[in-house]
Amino acid sequence: MSDIIYALKSKKSNIGLKIESSLRHDEFGVNFFASSDVALDTCELNVENIELLIKEIQLSDNFDNVIIDGRFSFGKDMYVLMDGFNECIFVSDGSPSSNVKFQNAYKCIGILDRQYGGSLAGKIKVIYNRFSSRSSETMENGEITILGGIKRIEGAKPAELVEQIMENTFLDEIG
């Protein structure tokens, strides 16, 4: 990913070629980029860099769905970027504190929708990760689509985790 970030920031390289050369594949047919060599590299990306990266990824035709794992922000740039997506899937553990935080964020998104004339709130869906019947609960909000949950899996190897996750049929509803 560091090479792609450098290409995006320098604007001197062919981003499409850099994406193609950096693409990795796993045994499950998932295409992905390796983590950055230095974690701070990703902090240097601005919204324009991310938009360009997404456009180049879409042009490459190597992905059915694009997953962006990043921090949530209420800034206008990030809002406009997220509103351009077909779906925005948030992941929560279903703990009471996580549910309250998500509900508050969802209310803020509704306000931003009205301010900017967008429709992000209607694109939001939730997946529960590490869901436990003892410490987790689903949100009671008829406006938010809850796709499903992935139970807590202790001590599993990465391949075992992927197998368990892929057994969830709700993942077919993404995209």
Question: What would you call each of these model-derived segments?
Answer:
Residues M1-F32:
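Phosphate-binding loop that captures ATP/GTP phosphates
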Residues E20, S35, L45-V47:
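ATP-dependent carboxylate-amine ligase catalytic core
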Residues G29-D41:
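Conserved P-loop NTPase mechanochemical-coupling segment
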Residues V38-A39, S133, A156:
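Active-site/binding-pocket entry motifs
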Residues D41-I54:
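Short glycine-rich substrate-engagement loop in P-loop NTPases that contacts/grips substrate
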Residues N46, S98-K101, V162, M166:
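Phosphate/oxyanion-binding active-site loops and adjacent basic polyanion-contact surfaces
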Residues L52-N65, G70-I146:
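Conserved catalytic-core segment of NTP-binding enzymes
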Residues K151-G175:
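NTP-binding/hydrolysis catalytic cores, primarily Walker-type P-loop NTPases
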